Amino acid sequence: MTKYVFVTGGVVSSLGKGIAAASLAAILESRGLKVTLLKLDPYINVDPGTMSPFQHGEVFVTEDGAETDLDLGHYERFISTKMRKANNFTTGQIYESVIRKERRGDYLGKTVQVIPHITNEIQAFIERGAASATCGEPDVAIVEIGGTVGDIESLPFLEAARQMSLRLGRNSACFVHLTLVPFIATAGELKTKPTQHSVQKLREIGISPHVLLCRADRPIPDDESKKISLFSNVPEDAVISVWDVDSIYKIPQMLHDQGLDRLICEELRLDPQPADLRMWAALVEKLQNPKHEVTIGMVGKYVDLTESYKSLIEALRHASIHTSTKVNIEYIDSEELETNGTASLAHLDAVLVPGGFGRRGTEGKIAAVRYAREAKVPYLGICLGMQLAVIEFARDVVGLKQANSTEFDPNTPERVVALITEWYDREGKVEKRTEDSDLGGTMRLGSQRCPIKPGTLAEAIYGKDVNERHRHRYEVNNRFVPQLEAGGLVISARTPSEDLPEMMELPSTMHPWFVGVQFHPEFTSTPRDGHPLFKSFVQAALACQQTRAGAKA
């Protein structure tokens, strides 16, 4: 039978519940247990697909095409179990489901209320999510409850967790509470009062945490841990210090050293094999002892909030580990390139243009593409980054001066990139879309496999085929492909059913390393294996740096 660990947060948001939950999962998996994770989001949006990156950060796409919270990306990077749509749900989905049942008459005329109908639905979603785990029936399901204790939005989820713990019985569920212990510089000491109040608030709801994870900018002294233990009614050995570190991949070892997995296994009456964290130690060792160093420019419009590119940043870190190369990421606002030109890119070893939506900043990104192509600097364009690379090539090489995307200019006569109006989803069903379709849930989403053109750089990187995840509405227009290919551009991968361009590149006679991909490879990168595309990109950046150094010598 699956046992449950509920992870809650207090004092402030953004303390790292997702990292803490994923790290615990990694330790338990290293002990031979089958583990899955779920994220419960209290907002009323059905999913984060239409939310601003400045408010929500990255939208992580699962293999089965769900638009989910970025924490699911952490889950997949820390454990081997793949996440699905059922691993993330929101208040919006819960209410949508309950209202649908009420309209059908499932409640037989009863007054539908938060308790029991909403809380029962939350419990059903949790159990369904755990049961759908790709690892089979999990030994442990770790359930992260979004928001902060005390928020009105989180109350139904916390109440559902309390009820579920009671229903499952002793040793079937436990609670881990992540809280903040701030350092007050003027007083020169850590303050435990916020943690005491947070735990008190949680206990008022009827939940007594079994373990406290205390976030601070430094290790918490024993005296402060004893005080927290006394006022929170949590055993002293269950007050765990979680201080700031320079890599999230150090967290599993930190938590294991303080006995978190032992406490959880004891509470849930589990007796697995000892933890083996040698892989994590090796990853950290490689990350901290690189042999080389490169600087990659990431050109986007969300650079003020790097959470918008969380998986992409981590994918570059994974490539750093597996190429023994420190990757410095320089964030460049594309709108500044429109105003000031591309002189600020001259020192970069490679240029990356990530995915995005909307017209703002696109001409600055196109200028970055042009610079990378003409200066022979390695270029990787992801999703929108590929589309803009095609537009730049069409304008500046092929001579289609009005080439554009209908996303930015619906009236352009040279629609090099246009809306996909019909395509097949992962189940083989035809999906249709128009300019008037709803924004939510109308994109091409999820993992799709396609063959790669032999003899291309793409084949050297991936092999015979590629299986990656998508999140987009627009595609390169096949009507212009013959002109683009005549100019030298290579379409190196296409979807087998709709014949949609998936990858483009420039031949080695035109550029040493220039690749665009319509999919999002960052979603499948893990620290264990890295990702072939990002490893190749970092190696190309290093080669560019060495070529420049040789030319100067």
From Swiss-Prot:
* Binding residue positions for UTP: S13, K191, T192, K193, P194, T195, Q196, K227
One GO process term, biological-process aspect: pyrimidine nucleobase biosynthetic process
Query: Which species is this record about?
Result: Burkholderia mallei (strain ATCC 23344)
What's the name of the protein?
A: CTP synthase
Catalytic activity line of the entry: UTP + L-glutamine + ATP + H2O = CTP + L-glutamate + ADP + phosphate + 2 H(+); L-glutamine + H2O = L-glutamate + NH4(+); UTP + NH4(+) + ATP = CTP + ADP + phosphate + 2 H(+)
Query: Subunit details for this protein?
Result: Homotetramer.
- Which residues hold ATP? S14, L15, G16, K17, G18, I19, D71
Q: Which HAMAP family match?
A: PyrG (MF_01227)
